Amino acid sequence: MSDYEEAFNDGNENFEDFDVEHFSDEETYEEKPQFKDGETTDANGKTIVTGGNGPEDFQQHEQIRRKTLKEKAIPKDQRATTPYMTKYERARILGTRALQISMNAPVFVDLEGETDPLRIAMKELAEKKIPLVIRRYLPDGSFEDWSVEELIVDL
C-alpha cells in the first residue's frame, strides 16, 4: 500500500451533506401591514401612524429626476482639477495606447526603426499626439474631460 492510497481512507469527511435541502416553514413568515395614507391597524385594532421614511417618502424619491450625462459634464472653463497628468493616468494612457499600437492601430509619430509598442506610445506621449481623453470623476458625480494634449506631462 502506498502513501497515495492511504490519503483516501474510509474516515469521516469534513464536508456538509449537500443532498439535504432545507426549506423554511411558511408559517414563520408574517404578512407585512398595508399602509394606506400612512396609517394601518394592528392585530389589537390599534391605529399605527407611520413616520419617517414610509412608502410615500420612497415614492417621492423615485420621482426625482436623475441628471443626464451632459448635465454632469463640467465645461472646460469651469474645471477644478489640476492640469497635470498623474502617474496613474500616464500608466493607463501608455498601456491603452501600446495595446492599440500592438493591434495595428495607426501610429502618429515617426517610428525610426522602433518596434516596441510601449516605446512608440511613450514617443507619442512626449509629442502629445495620443488621441485619447481622460475623464476625471468628482465626488458629486460630475466629471471633467481632459484631452492628452491639454495635460502637462512630467517625463
UniProtKB/Swiss-Prot annotation:
PANTHER family: DNA-DIRECTED RNA POLYMERASE SUBUNIT K, DNA-DIRECTED RNA POLYMERASES I, II, AND III SUBUNIT RPABC2. This is DNA-directed RNA polymerases I, II, and III subunit RPABC2. The keyword Flavoprotein does not apply. SMART domains: RNA_pol_Rpb6. Residues 111-132 are annotated as: Leucine-zipper. Belongs to the archaeal Rpo6/eukaryotic RPB6 RNA polymerase subunit family. One of its GO terms (biological process) is tRNA transcription by RNA polymerase III. It is found in: Cytoplasm; Nucleus.
